[in-house]
Regions:
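Conserved functional acidic sites
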Residues: 1-273
Length: 273
């Protein structure tokens, strides 16, 4: 963590998982590229999500510093994968950041995240009349709004034999999403206390390691979201403690919001009175 904050702007948020039916937290870290916001077409964000382990009391575990020292990911390469994605170039394994875990130091002890999802995004403002085929990495705030209901209807028509819509999975059978439908779709835009909030959902074949739906605010990053495949397991998942089966799905219009942003909005609301 110290290396990230020393080299890049990082905005950290805490999401309360209570709406799922389990009291825990998700720590999200937005890492901004050096050229973010400079109108150079190089607005990149890497999102690290430290997800909870419901069967234990901590989402971090101790790690020997020697392991950290010998296996660290070079800071100069962390945005390399998204560069390659943007230009459609093959990605060398040494630039693949997907398996990276965060490490933090508390006093003289090092801790590594148990579950860490890593996603990289290119933030665009492309005024196209039709959605770009962006797969899972372009946050285009200037695309047409496409509600989930529209994609659900289109998906069911194209894959009529599929038992589950990807966001409503009830079985362990997962139908591949047609490439023509894979996208990061804009579902809503709203203003809240001076912030323009863009609501997105990722409809792609990497839902098992992606933030499924999220809210994005320019210069603040991803400030809310849901992690469907981490919390909602298939029917054949072995739940040894019973903690996972107690969880509930969140409605399509509900997100886990950053506690820091909720506090900021509450203060703005209070100042209006």
């Amino acid at each position: 963590m110290d290396s990230l904050t020393a080299h890049y702007q990082v905005k950290q948020y805490t999401l309360d998982t209570s709406p799922y039916g389990a009291k825990n937290t998700i720590e999200v870290y937005n890492v901004f590229s050096e050229s973010y916001g400079l109108n150079k077409g190089e607005d990149y964000i890497i999102l690290f999500s430290v997800l909870p382990e419901l069967d234990s009391k901590t989402n971090w575990e101790k790690i020997d510093f020697k392991i950290v020292k010998d296996n660290h990911f070079p800071m100069k390469y962390i945005f390399r994968r998204i560069y390659y994605k943007k230009f459609g170039s093959p990605i060398e394994e040494k630039y693949n950041i997907s398996k990276v875990k965060l490490v933090k130091k508390i006093k003289d002890t090092y801790y590594v995240s148990k579950y860490c999802w890593v996603e990289d995004f290119y933030c665009a403002n492309n005024p196209l009349n039709a959605p770009m085929s962006t797969k899972d990495y372009v946050i285009n705030t200037n695309q047409p709004i496409t509600p989930i209901e529209v994609i659900r209807e289109t998906f069911i028509k194209q894959i009529s034999f599929c038992q589950d819509f990807p966001f409503e999975q009830n079985t362990d059978s997962f139908c591949k999403i047609p490439e023509s439908l894979e996208n990061t779709y804009l579902s809503n835009i709203e203003e809240k206390y001076g912030d323009i909030v863009y609501w997105f959902y990722q409809f792609c074949n990497l839902l098992h390691t992606n933030i499924s739906r999220f809210a994005y605010i320019k210069d603040k990053g991803i400030v809310g979201g849901v992690y469907f495949n981490h919390f909602i397991k298939g029917p054949f998942f072995t739940d040894k403690t019973g903690n996972w089966r107690k969880l509930k799905r969140l409605p399509e219009n509900e997100l886990l919001w950053a506690e820091e942003l909720k506090k900021e909005w509450a203060e703005k609301e209070k100042s209006k009175k």
